[in-house]
């Protein structure tokens, strides 16, 4: 893994954009994208740039089951708001959270990824080392699947809804096998609350109890962290 330490998330987003821009200029056509606050600075750099995205395909990591695309808490909505409405892509794939057949939708999403191999995959990381909704204990060889959200995740998400009963109880999520098939991975993490997860991902054993640790086995991973998220790392990783 290559580790890049920046002063803050603004610089981190700019550094991530440099990587994506260079990969696109070198022929990358399919981007694996993520949601949440971590990639917002990256997406802002996309929007502010003169980069033409009209020939790019994006494939998102996940989506809540039961949320319509126009629900402000859905990842369809997030991606339109933070990127696609201002920087249109040729084609953008996000799992169908309103599907009547989740298993079939997961198989279809695996086929989409197979038909459009991901050139650069963007990731964040959870405090417990999860990537996307792949929580500790998720098999490393799994493809796109339905995830039953943990009570902690449901409670954490309840602040976005009127009450906890409205919070989605499951999500459709790319598996670690899909993520590992990407040619290049860029993982971003900011803040001291991510420091322990970053340390375990990079320096700890490869274990399904730390889903992100599988990235140690990927041939091309760049980790972009601010100083706070890097504080637990061995000095050799700090530039």
Curated annotation (Swiss-Prot):
GO terms for biological process: carbohydrate metabolic process; glucosamine catabolic process; N-acetylglucosamine catabolic process; N-acetylneuraminate catabolic process. This is Glucosamine-6-phosphate deaminase. Belongs to the glucosamine/galactosamine-6-phosphate isomerase family. NagB subfamily. The gene is nagB. It comes from Lactobacillus helveticus (strain DPC 4571). PROSITE patterns: GLC_GALNAC_ISOMERASE. It comes from the Bacteria. It catalyses: alpha-D-glucosamine 6-phosphate + H2O = beta-D-fructose 6-phosphate + NH4(+). Catalyzes the reversible isomerization-deamination of glucosamine 6-phosphate (GlcN6P) to form fructose 6-phosphate (Fru6P) and ammonium ion. Gene3D superfamilies: 3.40.50.1360. Keywords: Carbohydrate metabolism, Hydrolase. One of its GO terms (cellular component) is cytoplasm. GO terms for molecular function: glucosamine-6-phosphate deaminase activity; identical protein binding.
């Amino acid at each position: 893994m290559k580790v890049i330490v920046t002063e803050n998330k603004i610089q981190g987003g700019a550094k991530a954009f440099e990587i994506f821009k260079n990969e696109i200029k070198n022929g990358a056509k399919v981007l694996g994208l993520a949601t949440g606050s971590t990639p917002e600075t990256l997406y802002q750099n996309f929007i502010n740039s003169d980069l033409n995205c009209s020939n790019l395909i994006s494939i998102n990591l996940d989506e809540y089951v039961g949320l319509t695309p126009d629900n402000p808490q859905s990842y369809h909505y997030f991606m339109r708001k933070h990127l696609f409405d201002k920087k249109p892509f040729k084609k953008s794939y996000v799992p169908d959270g309103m599907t009547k057949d989740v298993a079939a939708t997961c198989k279809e999403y695996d086929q989409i990824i197979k038909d459009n191999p991901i050139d650069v995959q963007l990731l964040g990381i959870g405090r417990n080392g999860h990537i996307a909704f792949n929580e500790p204990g998720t098999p490393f060889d799994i493809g796109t699947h339905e995830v039953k959200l943990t009570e902690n995740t449901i409670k954490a998400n309840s602040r976005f809804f009127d009450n906890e009963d409205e919070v989605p109880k499951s999500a459709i999520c790319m598996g670690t096998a899909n993520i590992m098939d990407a040619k290049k991975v860029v993982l971003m993490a900011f803040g001291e609350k991510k420091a322990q997860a970053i340390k375990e991902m990079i320096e700890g054993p490869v274990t399904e109890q730390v889903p992100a640790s599988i990235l140690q086995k990927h041939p091309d991973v760049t980790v972009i962290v601010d100083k706070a998220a890097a504080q637990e790392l061995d000095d050799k990783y700090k530039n």
